From Swiss-Prot:
It comes from Oryza sativa subsp. indica (Rice). Gene3D superfamilies: MFS general substrate transporter like domains. GO terms for molecular function: transmembrane transporter activity. Residues 471-485 have a biased composition (Acidic residues). Residues 470-494 are annotated as: Disordered. This is SPX domain-containing membrane protein OsI_17046.
Length: 696
């Protein structure tokens, strides 16, 4: 990947050259300050003040130029508006086309200005991170706190561009008035549902969204998948060839995601009854549910590595393992063996191909629909989470065929066996391997067919993200200076767990802790629900299934509200803190304080915990995708794998907690299992406040 120094020089507008952040100067100043502090020439307080002053001057120059350019664009739009008013009275169609092209020219200049701001905002972030890294001092915290919250903040002008958005609105409105719509003119304010079909406006909106992190429901939902985008310019060419994209293969990945989530949650309402029928305690349901997560800890790594070579074979292997695992799960009752049941669940966990599903979307889906695919991944997961318990509630019957028993405990296994067998056949017939895998397969096995496409994705991904002309000696010196900190290898993906861990900044670690906490709290709530509700309220399996299905059905509506409205009113970090506090309140409400534990208390506390954990997950992954290194966008040890491992470990620990607490008796189970998530939630809140300003 091209480093930022080269990228800045290659992409800057020549006539605006003197107004960009002087990235080279800032890096040299950092180097000098490091040497001076090591020699004892300056103390850190002096360095902090001097560097702050220099950065203030850089930002002031950027902001004043930005305001000047906004004024020029506003004047041009005003002049064109006067022409538009005159032309609409004359009804001269030819002049209308010329005027529309003039507006589009303003749009092109606006895109240049948006990229100017984006490049400078990126430069400021990188310089702040470099300072923290070089000095081991949280300069970002100090600088953001003192500058961003000041009433005369210039930093806000760079990161919160109200003026630019106003220019975008004026441009969109005027182009809409000129758009022919059944013989009348349009107003974007009177007809907000009408889409303005103009490529310039599409490009402008894309640039604004990239710059401001503006969020729609689709974007918010897509960020749940944590499919990290590499740091490319908004106008960059998509490296995934449209011809190499195969829609049915994407659908098969999403169906795999859906079925796996159904497979995970379909046993939750009946796991305690199954354990009792095999002679174990009801709380062994924690081990039964958690054994799948234990295996997933390991399967996520080897599936992620396997996806470097193929997507088809891992999905086939996944289907076979899940078929075999569910078969053993279903047969365990007639074999009267808890061991067989646990082996079956372990095999199901070893078939978890979610890392492959994420990787396929990241690497093999064109950029223009990758957001929709990511949202589809999350929607499939949410739908599976809701359908699993609901399906279990429908399987309340009992009959025998020969010596095989079919009841509420074994039917989930039999149903999923059939589902995975059908999926395997569909996969074998319809899946097409991406081009670079198919070509290598052709070389080794010419007879193999049915899994090919034409584009060479591997070569495309290997190309530099930005290219430019050869730079002069000064630029080479700057690049060499970059390489003192970041070797050529440092631009590639992480190649080991240790190298991935080194890329985790304090902000990323805190977000992973929050992710661990919310998954822990949700797993405790879901996995022990059948035991708790049976002990305190004498609920039937159907009642538990309905309750869990209702919880699962809240996922998409909650994300719709947060993604469409809440994130447009508040910053992500503000929603993060508020959600953590609400999860904490939900956990505190869940404790049994009196001998009588009521249904309203349990249901209300469960809803608060689950709903706000869902809100927290979306915002957490949104922030995580923003603060995580772009080096974790690809490769085996990618950001999606790290988040999956954190969440899976949380589930393992939570399920183990339920089983261990079960030995103390059902009366103490609820309060004992709620103590760890309470402590972790408080710790994550403290950690969030400590890194709050780095989430800017």
């Amino acid at each position: 990947m091209v480093n930022f120094g080269k990228k800045l020089m290659a992409d800057q507008v020549e006539e605006w050259k003197g107004y960009y952040i002087n990235y080279k100067l800032m890096k040299k100043m950092l180097k000098q300050y490091v040497q001076q502090t090591q020699l004892g020439g300056k103390d850190r307080e002096q360095v902090l003040k001097e560097f702050s002053r220099i950065l203030d001057e850089q930002i002031e120059r950027i902001v004043l130029f930005l305001l000047q350019q906004q004024g020029h664009l506003a004047n041009r739009i005003e002049e064109l508006g006067e022409q538009r008013a005159a032309l609409l009275e004359q009804h001269d169609i030819s002049q209308v086309f010329q005027l529309r092209e003039a507006y589009r020219e303003v749009g092109r200049d606006l895109i240049k200005l948006l990229r100017f701001v984006d490049m400078n905002a990126t430069g400021i972030r990188k310089i702040l991170k470099k300072f923290d890294k070089r000095f081991g001092y949280r300069f970002t915290d100090y600088y953001v706190t003192t500058r961003a919250n000041h009433p005369y903040s210039q930093l806000q002008q760079v990161f919160k561009q109200v003026g630019i958005v106003a220019v975008v609105g004026a441009l969109s409105r005027n182009l809409a008035y000129l758009q022919d719509h059944e013989g009348s003119v349009l107003s974007i304010y009177d007809h907000p549902s009408v889409t303005l079909k103009d490529p310039i406006i599409d490009q402008v909106n894309h640039a604004v969204q990239k710059l401001t992190h503006a969020t729609s429901f689709l974007q918010f939902l897509g960020q749940h998948a944590l499919i990290i985008q590499e740091d490319v310019q908004s106008g960059s060419e998509d490296l995934v060839d449209d011809q190499s994209y195969h829609f049915m293969s994407l659908i098969l990945n999403l169906v795999n995601t859906f079925l796996y989530m159904v497979n995970t949650y379909i046993i939750v309402p009946t796991a305690d009854d199954y354990a009792v029928s095999l002679g174990a305690a009801a709380t062994v349901c924690g081990v039964i549910i958690g054994s799948m997560a234990v295996a997933q800890v390991f399967s996520s790594v080897y599936f992620s590595a396997w996806s470097n070579r193929s997507y088809f074979r891992p999905l086939v292997f996944s289907s076979i393992m899940l078929f075999a695992g569910n078969l053993l799960y279903a047969l365990a009752y007639d074999l009267n063996s808890l061991t067989v049941l646990l082996i079956g669940r372990l095999l199901c966990g070893l078939g978890s191909a979610r890392a492959v599903n994420r990787r396929y979307i990241s690497d093999c889906v064109p950029l223009k629909i990758r957001l929709q695919a990511s949202a589809g991944f999350v929607s499939a997961s949410a739908l599976g989470m809701a359908c699993g318990p609901a399906l279990a509630g429908l399987l309340q019957t009992r009959f025998k065929i020969y010596s095989l028993t079919f009841d509420q405990s074994t039917l989930p296994g039999w149903v999923m066996c059939i589902a995975w067998l059908v999926y395997l056949l569909w996969l074998w017939i319809s899946f097409k391997e991406p081009g670079h895998f198919a070509k290598s397969s052709d070389t080794a096995q010419p007879a193999e067919s049915g899994h090919q496409v034409n584009a060479n994705l591997e070569e495309g991904l290997a190309q530099p993200l930005l290219t430019g002309s050869e730079e002069g000696q000064d630029q080479n010196a700057e690049d060499n200076d970059d390489n003192e900190e970041e070797s050529k290898n440092s631009h590639g993906p992480a190649t080991s767990i240790s190298s991935a861990y080194k890329l985790l900044t304090p902000s990323v670690k805190v977000q992973l802790l929050i992710y661990f906490m919310l998954k822990y709290a949700m797993e405790i709530l879901l996995s022990e629900s059948s035991v708790i509700t049976t002990y305190y309220f004498n609920w039937s399996t159907s009642a538990v299934a309905i309750f869990l299905a209702i919880l699962g059905c809240t996922v998409l509506p909650v994300n719709a509200i947060v993604g469409s409205y809440i994130t447009n009113l508040f910053e992500d970090r503000q929603i993060l803190v508020a959600s953590e506090i609400m999860v904490l309140i939900g956990i505190i409400m869940s404790f049994r304080y009196t001998p009588h534990y009521s249904v309203p208390q349990y249901v209300l506390s469960a809803l608060i915990t689950f709903v706000f954990a869902e809100v927290l997950e979306g915002v957490n992954l949104s922030l995580l995708s923003r603060v995580m290194s772009s080096r974790l966008a690809r490769g085996t040890y990618n950001g999606g794998l790290l988040s999956t491992e954190a969440g899976t470990l949380a589930r393992v620990v939570a399920d183990a907690t339920i089983t261990a607490a079960g030995y103390l008796g059902p009366d103490l189970l609820l309060n004992i299992t709620l103590l760890p998530p309470l402590v972790i939630c408080i710790a994550s809140l403290v950690a969030t406040f400590c890194t709050y300003n780095t989430l800017y």
